[in-house]
Swiss-Prot record:
Protein's organism: Thermosipho melanesiensis (strain DSM 12029 / CIP 104789 / BI429)
Quaternary structure and partners: Part of the 50S ribosomal subunit.
Example of a GO cellular component annotation carried by this entry: cytosolic large ribosomal subunit
Protein name, as recorded: Large ribosomal subunit protein uL15
NCBIfam families found in the cross-reference section: rplO_bact
HAMAP family cross-referenced by the UniProt entry: Ribosomal_uL15
Gene from which this protein is expressed: rplO
Length: 147
């Protein structure tokens, strides 16, 4: 057996249809495009968002909302996370939180929230604190510093 002897399995190779090559071919004259109309023309494609000339849905619906570009987006950390990760008396900074993988990025700052309980006195330095987080940290003898 040689490489030149290899043939495809009978019926596995379909012959390409050549359109517009005479009426006898079965795909002559209109070449399978029917008569007239947009889809019979060259590049005659109707896009999926086209609604037949009526005002499209995205123009019928009202505009609403906006993006507040002055809004501060804080990376959020709860006091229960500080309890698990940091030792008693340790200083907690945004850089240490980033380093230990508590937050993925600092964004516009770090905000400490009061979800969970804390028993270790920590010095927490952050950009913002919720009132419950501030109260819980100071209740166990910790310090709160706003950057």
């Amino acid at each position: 057996m040689r490489l030149s002897d290899i043939k495809p399995t009978p019926g596995s190779m379909k012959k390409r249809t050549r359109v517009g090559r005479g009426i006898g071919s079965g795909k002559g004259k209109t070449s399978g495009k029917g008569h007239k109309g947009q889809k019979a023309r060259g590049r005659g494609k109707v896009h999926p968002w086209f609604e037949g000339g009526q005002t499209p849905l995205h123009r019928r619906l009202p505009k609403f909302g906006f993006k507040n570009f002055t809004k501060k987006v804080y990376s959020v950390v709860n006091v229960e996370q500080l309890e698990k990760i940091f030792e008693s008396g340790e200083e907690v900074t945004p850089e240490k939180l980033l380093e230990k993988g508590v937050i993925k990025k600092i964004n516009d700052g770090v905000k400490i929230l009061g979800n969970g309980e804390i028993t270790k006195p920590l010095t927490v330095i952050a950009h913002a604190f919720s009132s419950s987080a501030r109260r819980k940290i100071e209740a166990v003898g910790g310090k709160v510093e706003v950057i």
